[in-house]
A protein has these predicted regions:
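Short loop/turn positions at the edges of beta-strands in beta-sheet-rich folds
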Residues: 29, 85, 108-109, 122
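Central antiparallel beta-sheet cores of small beta-barrel/beta-sandwich binding domains
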Residues: 22-23, 29-94, 102
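Sec/Tat signal peptide C-region and signal peptidase I cleavage site
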Residues: 15-19
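Positively charged n-region of N-terminal signal peptides that target proteins for export
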Residues: 1-4
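Bacterial N-terminal signal peptides
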Residues: 7-14
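Short, exposed beta-strand-loop hairpins at the edges of beta-sheets
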Residues: 95-106, 112-120, 124
Length: 131
């Protein structure tokens, strides 16, 4: 009986661990891009790996003029996300469409990723789907 209980607990822990795995490739809301989320030490980051507009699009809206000539494909847009109880939080998300960076939190919702950007008390949530 003790072995059965331990086996069930281990099985449940592996399912919970898998359910919280947000790493991998995600299609952004609207399907214009794909982001690869990856572990970097104890934090998560995410970089653009595909753009509908093609891989030659530049980061022209970046407020740092020295970065305006870099390609968006390969650019980190999610940085510094730390694991919390129910979500990854405390990170930043860069929006290449307007060149602004926002506070960010993400959480898994089935096969969807809820990506929330904050500006003060205001926020916007996007739903990304696993590729």
């Amino acid at each position: 009986m003790k072995k059965l209980v331990i086996s069930l607990m281990l099985a449940m822990m592996s399912v919970v661990g898998y359910a919280q795995n947000v790493t991998g490739r995600w299609v952004t809301e609207g399907g214009d891009s794909q982001v690869e989320i990856y572990q970097s030490g104890d934090k998560l980051c995410g970089k653009i790996v595909w753009l509908k507009a093609g891989d030659g699009k530049l980061d022209s809206k970046n407020p740092d003029k020295s970065l305006q000539s870099r390609k968006l494909v390969g650019c980190d847009i999610l940085t510094g996300l730390k694991k919390g109880k129910e979500k990854w939080e405390g990170g930043k998300i860069y929006n290449p469409k307007n060149g602004k960076t926002y506070k960010c939190a993400i959480c898994l919702d089935g096969n969807n990723l809820k990506v929330r950007g904050y500006l003060g008390v205001f926020y916007e949530t996007q739903t990304w789907t696993r590729k």
